UniProtKB/Swiss-Prot annotation:
Pfam families: Sdh5. Its main location: mitochondrion. Residues 1-24 form a transit peptide. It comes from Drosophila ananassae (Fruit fly). InterPro entries: SDH, SDH_sf, SDHAF2. One of its GO terms (cellular component) is mitochondrion. Plays an essential role in the assembly of succinate dehydrogenase (SDH), an enzyme complex (also referred to as respiratory complex II) that is a component of both the tricarboxylic acid (TCA) cycle and the mitochondrial electron transport chain, and which couples the oxidation of succinate to fumarate with the reduction of ubiquinone (coenzyme Q) to ubiquinol. Required for flavinylation (covalent attachment of FAD) of the flavoprotein subunit of the SDH catalytic dimer. This is Succinate dehydrogenase assembly factor 2-A, mitochondrial.
Length: 156
């Protein structure tokens, strides 16, 4: 039994280090870890139905603003949670009814949150139907000319 243990230990000393050299990420060429030059973003197949967001024409303005505040904080994607919650904390209170409707259409009319992120960061061009006053304001907010740290959502 001791002899078998010693043989297996000797084999481990010979085999395992040679395997570890090929599998260890620190031994690989660093050029393999470059950032891709373009974003891989496939269109959704046409057979996947995307439900329409129901419009709420009779919703009072203050109720709509409260709903948008909540929806801006709970996107399911941290990047948009941070961008939209800080945007709403800064601008939503001063929005008119028309601006509030534009913002509602922006965050609820798009079926993919990555689209909002790419448009706001100007990684992809914004479609004309979403290129509104509010989207331009959001793009300016994302540029962060004031250099404000946005590492967490603002308090309610």
């Amino acid at each position: 039994m001791l002899r078998q243990f010693l043989v297996s230990t000797a084999v481990r000393r010979v085999v395992v280090p040679s395997m570890a050299q090929t599998r260890c990420a620190s031994n690989l060429d660093k050029s393999e870890y470059t950032t891709p030059g373009e974003i891989v973003d496939y269109d959704d197949p046409p057979h996947i139905p995307v439900p329409e967001y129901p419009s709420r024409p009779d919703e009072p303005l203050e109720t709509r603003k409260q709903r948008l505040l909540y929806q801006s904080r709970k996107r399911g994607m941290l990047e948009n949670d941070l961008l939209l919650s800080t945007f709403v904390a800064k601008y939503l209170k001063s929005f008119t009814a028309d601006q509030t409707a534009q913002y509602d259409d922006l965050i609820n009319g798009v079926s993919n949150d990555w689209d909002i992120f790419y448009w706001a960061t100007e990684t992809k061009p914004t479609p004309p139907e979403f290129d509104t006053e509010i989207m331009r304001l959001l793009k300016e907010h994302v540029k962060n000319a004031e250099k404000v740290q946005r590492i967490r959502q603002p308090d309610l």
